[in-house]
Every structure is written in C-alpha cells, then in structure tokens.
Amino acid sequence: MGAQDRPQCHFDIEINREPVGRIMFQLFSDICPKTCKNFLCLCSGEKGLGKTTGKKLCYKGSTFHRVVKNFMIQGGDFSEGNGKGGESIYGGYFKDENFILKHDRAFLLSMANRGKHTNGSQFFITTKPAPHLDGVHVVFGLVISGFEVIEQIENLKTDAASRPYADVRVIDCGVLATKSIKDVFEKKRKKPTHSEGSDSSSNSSSSSESSSESELEHERSRRRKHKRRPKVKRSKKRRKEASSSEEPRNKHAMNPKGHSERSDTNEKRSVDSSAKREKPVVRPEEIPPVPENRFLLRRDMPVVTAEPEPKIPDVAPIVSDQKPSVSKSGRKIKGRGTIRYHTPPRSRSCSESDDDDSSETPPHWKEEMQRLRAYRPPSGEKWSKGDKLSDPCSSRWDERSLSQRSRSWSYNGYYSDLSTARHSGHHKKRRKEKKVKHKKKGKKQKHCRRHKQTKKRRILIPSDIESSKSSTRRMKSSCDRERSSRSSSLSSHHSSKRDWSKSDKDVQSSLTHSSRDSYRSKSHSQSYSRGSSRSRTASKSSSHSRSRSKSRSSSKSGHRKRASKSPRKTASQLSENKPVKTEPLRATMAQNENVVVQPVVAENIPVIPLSDSPPPSRWKPGQKPWKPSYERIQEMKAKTTHLLPIQSTYSLANIKETGSSSSYHKREKNSESDQSTYSKYSDRSSESSPRSRSRSSRSRSYSRSYTRSRSLASSHSRSRSPSSRSHSRNKYSDHSQCSRSSSYTSISSDDGRRAKRRLRSSGKKNSVSHKKHSSSSEKTLHSKYVKGRDRSSCVRKYSESRSSLDYSSDSEQSSVQATQSAQEKEKQGQMERTHNKQEKNRGEEKSKSERECPHSKKRTLKENLSDHLRNGSKPKRKNYAGSKWDSESNSERDVTKNSKNDSHPSSDKEEGEATSDSESEVSEIHIKVKPTTKSSTNTSLPDDNGAWKSSKQRTSTSDSEGSCSNSENNRGKPQKHKHGSKENLKREHTKKVKEKLKGKKDKKHKAPKRKQAFHWQPPLEFGEEEEEEIDDKQVTQESKEKKVSENNETIKDNILKTEKSSEEDLSGKHDTVTVSSDLDQFTKDDSKLSISPTALNTEENVACLQNIQHVEESVPNGVEDVLQTDDNMEICTPDRSSPAKVEETSPLGNARLDTPDINIVLKQDMATEHPQAEVVKQESSMSESKVLGEVGKQDSSSASLASAGESTGKKEVAEKSQINLIDKKWKPLQGVGNLAAPNAATSSAVEVKVLTTVPEMKPQGLRIEIKSKNKVRPGSLFDEVRKTARLNRRPRNQESSSDEQTPSRDDDSQSRSPSRSRSKSETKSRHRTRSVSYSHSRSRSRSSTSSYRSRSYSRSRSRGWYSRGRTRSRSSSYRSYKSHRTSSRSRSRSSSYDPHSRSRSYTYDSYYSRSRSRSRSQRSDSYHRGRSYNRRSRSCRSYGSDSESDRSYSHHRSPSESSRYS
C-alpha cells in the first residue's frame, strides 16, 4: 500500500486552447489493480488501437465533456467526446473491480459507467464527497495536485446537459516516473491540504455558486439521484454541502460525523492516503491545511485543531448563513425569518395535508409544529418530511404523493414542490404578513420581495434554495422533482407545493396534483384537465393560491377533485384574498372534492368553494366548508360508485394527470410569476408541464387539463410522472373513460364514456369528470372565479382554462349537475355512449364543456337534446344563453354551459356540437335547476374576483372554447353586470348559433351590437370582459362545435373510421364536421383540402376554432401526417385556417359553416362592436396572442386565435364583416402579434377567434395572468415590472419564447381564453389526440412560458414529433407545451395557445412556427431542449397525448421526467 508504490500519472489541461495547468493523479493500484492499469495505459497510450472504437487508446486529446458544479467533472471519452464512447484497454467494458474505496471526499478519481460492469475509459473526478455513488462507481485514485485546475473546470459554464461551453481538453497525459512520486507525495501532502483548501475554496465558491449552478447541478443531480435532495435545497446545500460535503472532504471519509470524527477521519484518511500515497509523515501537514481552508469555508473551519470548534464555527457560520437558509444540522435558525418559512411550506404541505385532518389546530400553532417538523427536514429531510406530509395527506396528498411518488415521484417532488411552493408562496405571503413564516418564508420573503409576484412560484425556490433548486430541478429534471419530492419535496415542496400549488396548482392543478392530487385531478383527466385548466386559471387569478389548492385538489383529483373544485373556487377567492390559506384548503378540498365532485357540485360548491376557499390553507383537510364539498364529493362518489373502481384507477391516472396539470399549473404560475425562476423551473416546470401535458395529452382531459393548467399560469413540471400515472390512469380512463386523461378529453370524448361511466357511476365520472372539471374549474374559479361562476359551464368549457376557474363552481354544479347529469346520463348514457364516442373526438371537447356542467347528464341531455335543441332548442339556447349570460353563475353556467355551449358554439362546440342543442335543453334543465346556484355562484364571485374570473374565464375560454362557454357563464356574474348585453349577445349568439343555419348575417348584426354594449360594459375587467366576449364567440362556436362534436362523437363511436369519409360527407352537418374532424384526420386532411374552399370561406372564423378543434381532434385521430399537414397549413398561414379550418370545417364546415361562421362572425362582430376596446385589448391580447402564438405555438388555440385573427383577417377579407372585425383586431395583433403573426398565420383561423376572443381576453389574460400569478392588475406598475421581468426571464429560458411570451402574456391570456375555448375543441380533438389535450395545457404555461415555453416548446415540439410519431401525443405535448407557457401567461393565451396547440397538434411545425415566430431561437432552443426534455419528459408527454398511449406515455413521462431531469 506504500504510497511510493502507487503509480502516478498526469493530465495537462487546456481550456479553449489555453493551457491551465497539470492535474496529477495517484492510483490505488494496490486496491484496484485492473482499473488502475486501464487508466495508466490510457494515460501512456501504450496499448495501441481499441478493439471496438478503432481509435488510439489514449486520453490525449480527449475532453472533459461533463461538468457538474459541486459534484464532479467527467472525461475520458476519447472516441466520441460526448460520454457515449470510450473503451477500456481490455476491449469494450470491464467489470467493476471492487467498491472498497468510497466517494467520501473531493478530488477522487472514479470510473464512470453505464451500469454494472460497464467500465470503459470514462472517469470522473469528484469535487465534493458523493456517497450516493458508493457501490456504483469504482474509486481507483485521487488527485494529488492540480486542484485549482479541477476547480477551474468545475466552475465553467455548462449547458443544460452539463456540457461545458468551453473546450476542456487533455493536451497531454502520461505516467510519472516513480522517482517523482516522492515529490508528488510532498506536493500531495501540501496539495491535499491545498486540495483541501482548494476543495474548501472550491466548496465555498461552489457553495455560493451552488445557489445558481448548484441549482443546475443539483437539478441534474436530482435527476440523477434523489439522494441529492438534501443538497437540493440551496441553502441547505450551501451550508450542508459546504458543511457536509466539505466535511466529508475533510474527513476524506464518508463519516460526516462530528468534526472530531471528521478530523480523525481526515487524519486517518490523510494518514491512510499519505500512508498509501507516502508515509504517515504527511498527516500533520495535510490535516492542518484542510482545516484552514475549511476554516475559511466555515464548514470545517476548526478542522485544523478543534473538531468541536468547527462545530461552533459551523454553528456561527450557519447562523449567518442560516439567515438565508437552514442550519447545517438542518435546524431552522430562528434569527432568520427567511428559512422560517422553510418549514411552513412543508408544514403548509403538512398543514395542507395534515390541516385537513387537524383543521382545528390554530394556524400559528400548526406552523410552529410544522416548523419543528421542518426543523428536521431543513437538513435534507425536509423534502422527505414533505413527502411524509404528502403521504400523511395521503388521503389527499397520498393519492397525489403515493400516486405521484409511486408512479413518478418525480412528479410528486415537482408537484409537491410546486404545489408547496405555490401554496407556500401564498401561504408564505400570508404568513409573511403574519410573520409566522418559516425559514422558507424568510428566503421566500427575500425572493418574494424581489420577485414576489414573479417569484411566487419561485417562492418555492426561494423558500428553499434547495427548494428553488428543487423547483428548478423539478422543472428541470424529474429526478429533481423526485428528489425534491423525496427530500423536502413534500415538505418544502409541499409548502412549495402550496406555493406552486397556488400558482401551479391552478396552473398545474396537477402540480399540486403533482404530488398526488395532481395525478388524480389530471388523472381524472378532465378532473385534472379541468382541474388543471381551472387550476391554471385560478393560478392566474391566484395562481399560487389556486395552485396550491389545485395541488391538493388535483392531487386528490380523484376524490379531491370535488374538493378541489370547491377549494379552488374558494381558493380562487381566497387566492386573491388569502392565496396561502385558500390553497391548502383548496388542495385539501380538491382532494376531497375530487372524491365527491359530482354530488357536491354546482349548487353547494358555489357556497362551499367560497367556504372552502375562505378557510385558510391552514384548514387543510378538516376545513368545514371543505367538508360539505367533501361530503358532496362522497355523495358523488356514491353515485360514482360504479366508476369508483375506474376512479381508483383514475385516481392514479388522475393523480398523474393532476400531477401533470398541477405541475403545469405550477409551472405556469411559476412561469408567469417566476419567469426567471421559471427559466429554471421552466425546464422542470416545462417538464412537469409536459408531464402535465402528457397527462393532458394522455387524454383530451389532459389537454384541457393543461389548458387549465396553462391558464392557471404555471406550467411546469413535475407533470411528467403524474402524467405517467395519469396516463396510466388515463389510459384506464381513456379506455374506461377514454382514459382518465381522456377523462378530461375523455370527459369530452369520453362523455359518452362519461355517460357510460356516469351510468356506471354517475357520480364517478362526474366525480372524476367533475372533479377534474372541478379541479380545473375550481382552480379557474378559485383563481378566477373563486365564486364558482358557472363552474360547470366553465368547467366544461373552461375545463381547460375555465375549468380551473370554475373549478369550484363547476365542482358544485358539476356535482349537482353531475348528479343530475349522472341521472340524465344514466338515462341517456347509453345514447351518449354511442353519441359520446362520436362526441369523443368532438364531443370530447364538447363533453368537456358539458361534462363540466352536468358533465354526464348535461352531456347526455345535450347529446339527446342536442339534435332537438339544435333545431328547436336554439331559441331556448338563445334564452338560455341570455340566462346563462345573465345568471352565468355556476348553476346557470352549469346548465348554461349547455345553453351557453349552445349559445356559444365555440364553447360548447368543443364540448360537443351535440351539446349545442342538447346543452340548450340541458341548459334549460340545468339552468332551471341551477340558475340559482350559478347565479349565486356567479354572484358570489365579486367583480374583483369577477375580474379574475373573467380573466381566467377568458383565459379559460381562450384555452378551450368549451371553456369559453364556461368562461362566459362564469363571467356570467361579472359579465352579467358587465356583459349584460354580452349575455344578450350570447343569447343572440345562441340564437344565432341556432339561426346560423338560418342566417349568418342576422347573427352577425345581432352579435356585434350586443357585443359592443357588453364589450364596453365590463371595462372593469378589461381582459375579462373581452375574454368573456371572446368566450361568447368561442362559446357559440364551441357550442356548435361541441354540438357537432357530440353528435359527431356519437357518430364517431359508431362510425369511428368509417366516418372519416362519411363524416366528411356529413361535414355538411355540424355533427359530422366535428366528428369527421376528429375521426377523419386523414380524411380531414383530404377533406380539409377539399372542403377548405367552402368551409374556409364560410367557416373561416369557425374554422379557426374548428380547425383548432379539428387539428386537435385531427391530431389524436388523424395521422401525424395529417397533423403535420394541418400544422403546416396552420403554420402556413391564414390558410392554416383553411387547412385547419378545413379540418374542422371540412367536417363542420358544411353543416357548421353557417353556425361556426356565424359564431365567429358574432365573435368578431362582438369584437368589432368593441373594436376600440377590443383593439386595445387586442393589442394587449394580440400581444399576448402573439406571444401566445409564440408561446402558443403549442397553443394552437392561441396561435390559432392570432392566426384566426390573421387568417380570418386574411380569409375574412373575403368575409368582409369578419375582416373588418379582424382588421381592427388584427392590426393590433399584427403590431403586437408580429411574433404571433407567423403563429397566427399558422393558426390564422383559430387566431381570428382568438383575436376576437383575445381582445376581450387580453386584458383579462393579462389580468388573469397577473392576478393568478401575482394578483397584479394589467397596466399596473407591477404588471409592467412583471412583464419586464418576464421578458427578461423568458429570453433566459427561451430567448424567443420568453420574449414573445412576455408580450404574449397578455396575449397568452387572451389567446388562452380562446385557445382554451379552442382547446376545448382541441381538447376534444385532443381527446382523440392526446396531443390536442396537451395543447390546452400548454396554454396555461404562459408564466412558465418564458422558460417554460422553451421547455414547453421543447416538450411540445418533441411531442410534436412524438405526435408525429404518435401525432396525438407529441402534438399534444407540443401544444401542451405551448399551452403551458401560454396558459401560464394567461388564459387567453391558452386559447391562442390552443389553436396553436391545435395547429401544433396538427403539425409540430405549426406550433413550431408559432413558437418560432414567438421565439424562433427559443423554439429551436426549446425545441432541442424540448427534444431532449421531450425525450425525457415529452416522451411522457407524448404518451400523454394518447389516452391509451398516454398512459404508457404517462409512465414514460415519469421516466421521461427522470430522463429529462437526468
């Protein structure tokens, strides 16, 4: 073992062709002779050429291709230079020799491998102790000099894959003569000390840099290992890494025990190494220097002599350090208010989960207790604790966490983190005020103060640097999430989850879901999707607050969805008022609500959600308002009993989906609120979002979910695993219910299924659907409509975007309506099953809206009545539209959603065309049944909330036309006041929709007048009102589309593939059009092309919407080629309207041409009537739309809206009336939408709608975004600042995407609104094409947009590719990606996004184009990144696209996430 006997070798390193020094290694040839021989021979190059690589077996000229700060630097790939090559001197790989030596210190030389016994030539040099690598990698040497070179390399900037940007090469290498060994040893003695010192300094610098780079590294690390979770928190990491890592270094042994042990270990190690290296003589020299360096580092400060001293210094340094973070022991330092919050987030998570159980405990007491809990976690347990908390919340969180954790606990981590972060954010904000904040809060406060709005999401991050890392990593890596989740994920993440949940819960109800609810909600597919949408919306309004609730809500989506609904709703209100408290409640409620979504539904939920939401987040599970919802949920569950087994399955799926959505929401919120963080998060968030998206994709539900998620604002991340789960579950749902994911989509598409399911368990699907809807809706409602405006309606239409908004109200109404629906659905369920299958594609969208209303019942009624109502009920619809608009409260909206869907074909169209008429009738029924509820719900929603709601609804509307209807219904209350004439307009819209076949012109004239009156009436909610108007338009169109969709879907069930031709023929019919779209994507492409002239002209406006829907539908049903064609068309231009339109138009074009066209015209007319306001909004909205377009490249809807604007502008030039509208709108759009222009061109038809919608939505979008995110009013200083921040942030994540997204933020909101509406249509399509589903989601990601967009884009793109491969999945993912960003940005954006998404769904390129338009570089970047991530996360995401595929994708997503993270 003589050190002298140990061989030494050297590397001469150059960085960017500048020599920086020599690294000397000593190899433990006495311990690992074979490994050492391999290394030595590779240094000397004496072995000639490799057998497998054919290259010279020598390290000379090789690079250090992977550099992870505070972890290691890796090289030795002499053949490929990227980590994929290299071979040993023995040929290929050789076995792991032994694991005697441990990675217990820095500067050890160890073999890299690809698994067991796969040692080649690649090695790595640790820069921190890495005990997690023990038993995995063979340590065979150590560095005896050149530590500064290693540190220099370690500190190089790296890309997302940890590749240093600089060229780090071994210019020379060789084996040293044994004689120099003594000198080397001498050097070694000094250098080890120096090494130690270097290590220390490296650590210190590393520690400080660790905050930023450590985030990346830890994100990666997390991706790689969950072990790093403890380190994941920056503060902990800094302290802990500085302390622990450095301690291990000091020790050189793995013992991170007392300093005495450490020093002893160090001494032993030193002695050992010196003995090994040389003689024990080195001991004294080596030992003292180490302490000195450490002394500076503070960690091992006294290591030199006093081992206790280090502790004292540690403590003292810790105290100073601790002010920013936790003490090394993990103990929260009271002195620092920052970390104080650290625990509460977890405690918040705990609180959220535990509070549910122990709501009686006073918040401050709980916080203290949780703080104690956090105490342990601060070190690294925090996340674990969080996990535990999550698990404790298992009833809510557990489904989330178990599902998430078990499924993809990266989801849980992410979701947890996001949810917690969000909840934390809101809670923290509240607590900051209370000053009961924990460490996290202190940090958060700092960060929050800086980016309070922006960092709400980041709050998670700030709350814990680790958390932030965690968050970032969450977004960045599934491992991140996982680790986050694992370590402190649930705790911190939980707290974060709450924060994120608030933001992302809404944004990613799934994120909150993330843990488990996320999955559930999303899994519930519609639940998630809706939850997500809602969540996002809520997220926007009270992004964080909702997110949080959503997190829980989504988490619980299965059971919680219901709870989620009411909490969301409440959360929405609270979100604005008490984001923090509401979130937990919301989460809890979401969880519980999911269970009883149906029974609790509309009537009670409006009250309960408010009640639920109002209870502080502290009320967690035990909330009383919550309990009524929960009881109702249980009632729903009773009804859902048949579905319960499925629901259980869905629970997982939903949880996944929810997780995904939550992730998304969180991401989106984070995105909005934390562009910067989100840039970091963006990756993770995006990933999550993709996850979410995946989930969304997984089922249309996912799309919706995402839309909601997106609406909610944060998109992000952690969605992947849940997606896997959700997908798994959703596959269940999809199959069972068109997959839970499908559940959402499936809710639409599965509306038949849903009817079946509802029949199976009227409560279950309702529960699930409604839960999802609730989740989404509630999120949306919570954030936007805390009041639970037409939750049902919103849930349906807004399912994606609005669902979040109207989650509560929808939940309530959904529950009530679900109950009624369930009954009706039971009656008509069978009819609907057949119908629904047809509807599935179209009806998916339709169903979403309808489902959201009385999902089952309404849908069945809608479907049954659809035809009747279509002819006979149109007047009714008109009236109901009016009453919807007037009441537009939850009950009315629930009912109205039908009526509104009828009124607003856009809105209901997505749900299903059949719903248009059916919905009228059902609407009548439900309106009769729930007018009070809706009214009350709507009424309960104050104008402020109304503004929120409006915004969110708009966003929702953007996101899904079905959402549009909901949005408008939801807006009903605010809109009632503001949209008094808008309601009339919508009634007229409904009439017109009915009359559309009779006369477009009449409608056009009618609509514009009313629109004008309404448009200006609600200046309060500038964006909101416009969004509402857009919702009107979209609702009308969507209603029609959904009617058609539903009818078509029914047909589709019967004539799935036969209908391709048949439906094209039927395309003359509204029903056929939608189904044909969905079914006949191939046919559609042809049909689009063939029908394009006719449909294009007449249906241009509708075509936009329909195109999006069709694109979405096409994507799922259509082949990738078709999608590509559509997308290309979309990308192409206004022609996208043409092809895309043709897509929707071809089926819908003939029959629907009149109606949708009129709808569009109406929308446009309304917009035209409000040209000034609309233009103003449109400018914003267009900006948003553009950004959305860019963001919304995924956001087909958004892009489509912009595109629709563009396309309709262009196409509608033919349609002069529309063109005028568009011209007014489009001009701002062109100005603002320069970025969006290409995207808009891509989705021109959709964009027109979005434009029309966006103008209304835009302010709303902005507001929603801002509100959801930061509760900043558009135009306010904060808004401006935030925009700037987002702009800065977005470019960071995705230069183009970010930039575009920032402007797009408003646009995104508006875009999202239409997009959402569209998304709904899309979602239907998406149901078929999970891809479409994703589209929606992405809308939500607007905040996340900047980074998220890059990620979302990437994901979406990857998915788009995937989608191509699996058109649905990828497209969906792609779209979702965008949607996420977009949604995050703003619901409106979601809408825009959705069209884009749709477009994107059609063609990856369309989205890409949009994205490119928005951020071509971002897109490319994103795209590549997304590609990688997509592979990682989009894989899942892709899988999210297909319900069935989605499920497996969902699983993929988990891995994907992991992959992505790693």
From Swiss-Prot:
**Sites of Phosphoserine modification:** 379, 401, 416, 463, 471, 613, 648, 866, 887, 889, 891, 907, 1077, 1146, 1203
Question: Which residues constitute the cross-link Glycyl lysine isopeptide (Lys-Gly) (interchain with G-Cter in SUMO2)?
Answer: 323, 578, 581, 639, 656, 666, 1057, 1163, 1177, 1216, 1225, 1258
Instruction: Give start-end positions of Acidic residues composition bias.
Output: 910-922, 1022-1031
User: Which UniProt keywords are present, listed alphabetically?
Assistant: Cell membrane, Isomerase, Isopeptide bond, Membrane, Phosphoprotein, Repeat, Rotamase, Ubl conjugation
Q: What is this protein called?
A: NK-tumor recognition protein
Residues passing through the membrane, by range: none
- Cellular localisation: Cell membrane
Catalysed reactions listed for this entry = [protein]-peptidylproline (omega=180) = [protein]-peptidylproline (omega=0)
Record PANTHER family: NK-TUMOR RECOGNITION PROTEIN, PEPTIDYL-PROLYL CIS-TRANS ISOMERASE
Q: What is the lineage of its organism?
A: Eukaryota, Metazoa, Chordata, Craniata, Vertebrata
